[in-house]
Amino acid sequence: MNEVAVEADRLTKTYSQDGESFNAVDAVSFELPFRGVFGLLGPNGAGKTTTLEMLAGLRPADRGSVRVLGVDPFVDRQTMTRRLSIQPQKAALFQHQTVQELLGMWASFFPHSRAPADVIEELDLSASARTRVAHLSGGQLQRVLVGTAIISRPEILVLDEPSAGLDPNIRDDLWRVIRNEGERGTLVLLSTHSMEEAEELCESVIIMHEGRIVADGTPRDLIIENVPGGDVGFVIDPERFSQSRLRSDILEPELDYSVERLASGLSIFVETSDTDFFLKRLLASEAASSVRHITVGRVGLDHVFRTVTGKELLDD
């Protein structure tokens, strides 16, 4: 059985501007499996949205090829409609409908849809269920757009800047919903220019700059590969790996370290003179699967982006 759900091979999209042509997406190649959360990270104009649109069959490629669930997404629209769902940054919704009516209509298009009430509850929209779309706030509208994308139970969920402009509390709730989709077995592919979002959600990240892929890998590996050395910070889930086990298995007595309890887990900062040795020890341990947000020398994906592109990426 083919384990690849999405396969892009030298995917290219060319536009013309002021009489000159340029590649908005330039020979991009990657593969994605059938489940998990993956991200395209880069600034505006990097080619993220155009790449997503070609994967979803909304825009044809000029060169190269893309296969999604074994078919050409631009040719086989029936497969894409049934098995892939996309939440664009902006969408034309019926302004006179309530949230409940809109999601009910959306659910009626698909035979195995989730109950609109369940989606409304998961997105924390119960208080707005009878509110007309025209009267929704920006944060509420963003969640409704995500609701229209997840209600059909898609095999592939494409999200374009899903938390752009949201306040931290609403953003964190939306991240929980996205995480849940990945854990249900959905392949989630999102675009973002938020370092925090990429580190928090994505198993693997593709960094794009000027239409090209300049780096890819897990946030952890990208940080380790592109930071020369320094003290190590990380967050660990105490429910999956206890602080006492961490102390006995990883944090040797001669190491200086600090522990801070955060909403996302235990934040550990370790002062070490041998970064490589400590990281190898940490990532070879049973704790590795519970570790998130590794920083080296107090830097993270922002440093990686500067290293591979030579430019700053402004985070939300």
PLM regions and their residue ranges:
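ABC transporter nucleotide-binding domain
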Residues: 176-271
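ABC-family P-loop ATPase nucleotide-binding domain
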Residues: 1-14, 311-316
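Solvent-exposed beta-strand sheet faces enriched in polar/charged residues
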Residues: 9, 235, 260, 295-297
